[in-house]
Design a protein with these regions (language model features):
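Conserved donor-binding/catalytic core segment of Leloir-type glycosyltransferases
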Residues: 7-9, 176-195, 199-203, 215-221
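Glycosyltransferase donor-sugar binding loop
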Residues: 41-46, 187, 214-228, 246-247
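Donor nucleotide-sugar binding/catalytic pocket of nucleotide-sugar-dependent glycosyltransferases
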Residues: 132-173
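Nucleotide-activated donor-binding/catalytic signature segment of Leloir-type glycosyltransferases, i.e.
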Residues: 228-248
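Acidic donor-binding loop of glycosyltransferase active sites
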Residues: 258-273, 286
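Short hydrophobic beta-strand element within catalytic cores of glycosyltransferases
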Residues: 283, 287-290
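Conserved acidic donor-binding segment of nucleotide-sugar-dependent glycosyltransferases
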Residues: 302-303, 307-314, 323-329
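A short, well-ordered alpha-helix in the C-terminal region of glycosyltransferases
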Residues: 316, 323, 330-345, 351-354
């Protein structure tokens, strides 16, 4: 029997972010490519992280070419299903609205897979409300977590929603490298909304209490610049406590995971949905401290695999870190529970199986 044809219109690296990494996992998946006759088109117009959300003539021209390419692909391959990873709000949504409308005009079955959020923040605007009604009509939607349904509840019935948590490849379980101090790791782009300053303030609190910590910030410089961050470390007299390493990948990143006692990610990023960095930390048996942003409460089990805290709460971050320092056995147990949860729910194999089943169901019920 001939495999059903699917056109995947998704984000691929560069730039590297959660949605593009998941796009790459789908693109490279033997399970998905062997199950379906897959065709791929890269939806990304941004060349790097700083380019995300910006306009310009180049992007306009590239988008026009994209629409033409989509139209030609639909006519030539005649897919049974189209899969799109759209943006939820703003100018990027208006662009993706046109993509989905083109697919609908061409009588395609469409499923959208959200890696961001923000519909609910714009649904009271007249234009956006009208466009959302048109956009979501007769659409199936994949969400990363039950927690994210509230974002689209106004427009989508729950029966048209699939829940599919992200997954990442299983890596070798790295041996722990014992350290004298309690080591904390932040692993993400160096953006204010990722909670960088909140963690730095927590480090300041712990330093004033005489706690022997080392906090490592690993990630690409973004709206927080290196000089700015170093100046802040110096101002707070944290040069022996806090270290900035820039972006690290592969084995270089693994070195930090090996030396870490607790992973802290106090994000309040407005597009945060299901951060892959938490899965990486859980895979390595690290207790995680993060916020109630997006789908994070469905990743971390509060007080079992780590802690869910309020956003903008450096004092609470400091308290949780101090507790883990003073209760090493509980710290280790949380890490073990996190790794078990990762292996049960968040591996790439589990993700691929979920996506395959969802797409098969969509084609059957179309």
């Amino acid at each position: 029997m001939t495999n059903k044809k699917i056109l995947f219109i998704l984000h691929l690296p560069p730039p590297v972010h959660g949605a593009s990494m998941v796009g790459k996992y789908i693109h490279d998946s033997e399970v998905i490519n062997n199950t379906f006759d897959c065709h791929y088109l890269n939806l990304a117009l941004a060349k790097d992280l700083n380019d995300i959300g910006k306009g310009g003539m180049r992007k306009l021209k590239d988008f026009y070419k994209q629409l033409k390419q989509i139209s030609l692909l639909i006519k030539s391959i005649k897919p049974q299903q189209c899969y799109v990873t759209p943006n939820a709000k703003g100018g990027a949504f208006y662009k993706d609205f046109l993509v989905v409308m083109l697919l609908k005009i061409m009588r395609q079955n469409v499923i959208v897979h959200y890696h961001n959020k923000g519909v609910a923040t714009r649904q009271n605007r007249c234009l956006d409300n009208l466009l959302y009604k048109m956009f979501f009509k007769n659409l199936k939607v994949i969400l990363l977590s039950e927690n994210l349904y509230q974002d689209i509840k106004k427009y989508v019935k729950y029966k048209d929603v699939y829940i599919c948590p992200n997954g990442i490849p299983i890596h070798e379980n790295l041996p722990t490298v014992p350290q004298k101090e309690f080591n904390i790791l932040f692993l993400s782009n160096m953006m204010e909304e990722k909670g960088v300053w909140d963690l730095l303030e927590a480090c300041t609190i712990l330093k004033k209490k005489g706690k022997p910590i080392k906090c490592h910030f690993v990630g690409k410089w973004s709206d927080i610049k290196e000089e700015q961050f170093i100046d802040e470390i110096n101002k707070r007299e944290l040069t022996e406590y806090v270290f900035a390493h820039g972006a690290k990948y592969g084995n270089e990143k693994d070195v930090f995971l090996q030396k870490t006692d607790a992973f802290v990610f106090p994000t309040y990023y407005n597009n945060e949905c299901f951060p892959l960095v938490l899965l990486e930390a859980m895979e390595q048996g690290l207790p995680c401290i993060s916020t109630n942003e997006g789908g994070i409460p469905s990743i971390i089990e509060n007080e079992k695999t780590g802690y869910i805290i309020e956003k903008h709460s450096p004092q609470i971050i400091a308290e949780k870190i101090e507790y883990l320092m003073e209760h090493p056995q509980q710290c280790a147990n949380m890490g073990k529970a996190g790794r078990k949860k990762f292996l049960n729910e968040f591996t790439l194999d589990k993700f691929e199986a979920r996506i395959k089943n969802i797409l098969e169901d969509c084609i059957i019920t179309a």
